[in-house]
Curated annotation (Swiss-Prot):
Entry protein name: Uncharacterized N-acetyltransferase YedL
Alphabetical list of Pfam families matching this protein: Acetyltransf_1
Family stated for the protein in its record: Belongs to the acetyltransferase family.
Limits of the N-acetyltransferase domain: 4-153
GO MF terms held by the record: acyltransferase activity, transferring groups other than amino-acyl groups
Keywords (A to Z) from UniProt: Acyltransferase, Transferase
Amino acid sequence: MFTIKTDDLTHPAVQALVAYHISGMLQQSPPESSHALDVQKLRNPTVTFWSVWEGEQLAGIGALKLLDDKHGELKSMRTAPNYLRRGVASLILRHILQVAQDRCLHRLSLETGTQAGFTACHQLYLKHGFADCEPFADYRLDPHSRFLSLTLCENNELP
C-alpha cells in the first residue's frame, strides 16, 4: 500500500532520488535543455513537493509549481528504480491533478525531454489527458524539450 506525503525534502532517500532525477535528466539532455529543480529550488514557496512511500521505502516523487493563480507546472516526477511499472507515477500524477483542481487551477503544464528515454513519460501524460502545447512560462522552443498541457474544465472538474 502506497502513502503520499507532503514532503520537506529533508529525508536522505528523498534527496537521493532528487539527485538521481537530475542526473538522469542530464544524461539524456544537454545542460541548457535540462530544467530539473534541485532540492533548494524545490523548497521555494511556490512549489509543493510530495513523496510516495511503501512502508519505509521511497517509491517516487512529484511536485507542483504555481506559475500564477490559475496555472501550475508539474515538476520532478520520478519513480524510484525498484518501483517502476507499479503505478507510482500514475498515483502521484492523479494526486497532483486533484490538488490542482482543489486549488482552482485552470491549466497544468509540463516540460519533458524528446529523447527515446522519455517515451514512458509521454505515454503517461497523454493517457491522463495532456496534449502538446507551445512553450509556457520562461521556456523557449528547444529540440530537446516537449511541452504538454492539460486544461482543467471551466467548472474546475478534471476532464
